[in-house]
């Protein structure tokens, strides 16, 4: 008949915690505090900014609001493959505190030391993208935090509001199946 049995993994490893998830307007103070909190526990941060044309300006802005000892590196899909690989290896090695990047971190990354995810313009992304990005943090015993920002003063359309509400509501580990339903 072509029908196959389906197996679901309903329990995460015992040492993992649900990711603390926040959906809010973008705020420099919140961004600074989130990055500083992660730095204080010797962790790293993903900052997803999905606009290559203005990513340098965002890096400059972050450097203005953060202390000088916070190191930021940029990564995006238009970079030369070897350059991108070197940046990612340096980030994995702990040489940078913040990886300012496009959605290229959506899949396949396992950096247990990165436990804070900041996503700019999250309202412009699909639910599966947002869910996958959130899954890049919380891959160790540390409590992870994910912040999904929309622009200050922006009125969200109904569909975007529903996506962000869903990601905020379903925070327990393994909630992907519930989100898909």
Residue ranges: model-predicted function:
Residues 1-42:
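Post-DEXD/H (motif II) to motif III coupling segment of the RecA-like Helicase ATP-binding lobe
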Residues 28-44, 50, 54-57, 61-181:
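C-terminal helicase module of SF1/SF2 nucleic-acid helicases/translocases
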